[in-house]
Swiss-Prot record:
Its main location: cytoplasm. NAD(+) binds at D53, G54, N129, E130, R155, D157, T168, A169, Y170, N171, K172, S173. The gene is nadK. It is found in: Cytoplasm. Involved in the regulation of the intracellular balance of NAD and NADP, and is a key enzyme in the biosynthesis of NADP. Catalyzes specifically the phosphorylation on 2'-hydroxyl of the adenosine moiety of NAD to yield NADP. Its EC number is 2.7.1.23. NCBIfam families: PRK04885.1 (NF003424). GO terms for biological process: NAD metabolic process; NADP biosynthetic process. It holds the Pfam family NAD_kinase_C. This is NAD kinase. One of its GO terms (molecular function) is metal ion binding. Its cofactor is a divalent metal cation. Gene3D superfamilies: Probable inorganic polyphosphate/atp-NAD kinase, domain 1, Probable inorganic polyphosphate/atp-NAD kinase, domain 2. HAMAP family: NAD_kinase (MF_00361).
């Protein structure tokens, strides 16, 4: 077995901020001459994301075709992020934990997105946080189908479908529930729905179990804006967009420093109670 076969392959991905570059340099120096590690962005075993949650989203999409083989770990160089276990001043702890890593992981569900266009084209994608469909110019009218049952006819700005880890992002700002990331479920949340004596929607978020699927079927021709995490695309004449739990998941390195989900929620939205 050669050196690279024996060593853990590590990819270090950082944003352009000064502090992120400093952390990346320290990690490079620590692993460069360590025989147990091999620095490579090609086919890594571990991806270290340095920056914020946006950087980890980018790292996820960079390696989304290798999810069976890769584990992620995040280092935050700003405020605490939901996908980061380490702050920039905890790099030595991260290095020590990785040197003692035994391959344990924590897995979270991700979203499978299938977009069907009028011309027959099918676009497939994955989202770690969420996906939205909107019609910017006019009110969006679409049937919401859950597990092949027409649930409602939606009228409004758009619809968001989020994963449990994404429930604390855009979904929460829309009044959706916060789900623990180990719950294998999707959440459907309306964006500025029309509700009056003529038009009615449920008006609250819906939690969809793993075995069920969501279909959004637009009822008007036109250009639709579809977001997949931090990327936005525009498609003309969308026939339907399907959402379900993907058969793959995202895996994070499980270390003694792994921060519990509820600690992250507290730090992000509540903070320490006053005494």
């Amino acid at each position: 077995m050669n050196f690279t076969d024996r060593a853990t392959r590590v990819a270090i991905i950082a944003n352009g901020k000064y502090q992120s570059k400093r952390v990346a340099s320290k990690l490079f120096a620590a692993f460069k001459h360590d025989p147990d590690f091999y620095l490579s962005k090609k086919d890594p075993d571990i991806v270290i994301s340095i920056g914020g949650d946006g950087m980890l989203l980018s790292a996820f999409h960079m390696y989304e075709k290798q999810l069976d083989k890769v584990r992620f770990v995040g280092v935050h160089t700003g405020h605490l992020g939901f996908y980061t276990d380490y702050r920039d001043f905890e790099v030595d702890t991260l290095i020590n934990n990785l040197k003692n890593d035994e391959g344990e992981q924590i897995s979270y569900p991700i979203l499978k997105v299938t977009i069907t266009l009028e011309d027959g084209r099918v676009i497939r994608a994955r989202a770690l946080n969420e996906s939205t469909i909107k019609r910017i110019e006019k009110t969006m009218v679409a049937d919401v189908v859950i597990n092949q049952v027409v649930f409602e006819r939606f009228r409004g700005d758009g619809i968001l479908v989020s994963t449990p880890t994404g429930s604390t992002a855009y979904n929460k700002s829309l009044g959706g529930a916060v789900l623990h990331p180990t719950i294998e479920a999707l959440q459907l949340t309306e964006i500025s729905s029309l509700n009056n004596r003529v038009y009615r929607t449920l008006g609250s978020s819906v939690i969809i179990p793993k075995k069920d699927a969501i279909e959004i079927v637009p009822k008007r021709v036109g250009v639709y804006t579809i977001s997949i995490d931090n990327k936005t695309v525009h498609y003309k004449n969308v026939t339907k967009i399907e959402y379900s739990i993907d058969e793959k998941s995202i895996n994070f390195v499980s270390t003694p420093s792994h921060t519990s989900f509820w600690e992250r929620v507290n730090d992000a939205f509540i903070g320490e109670p006053e005494h």
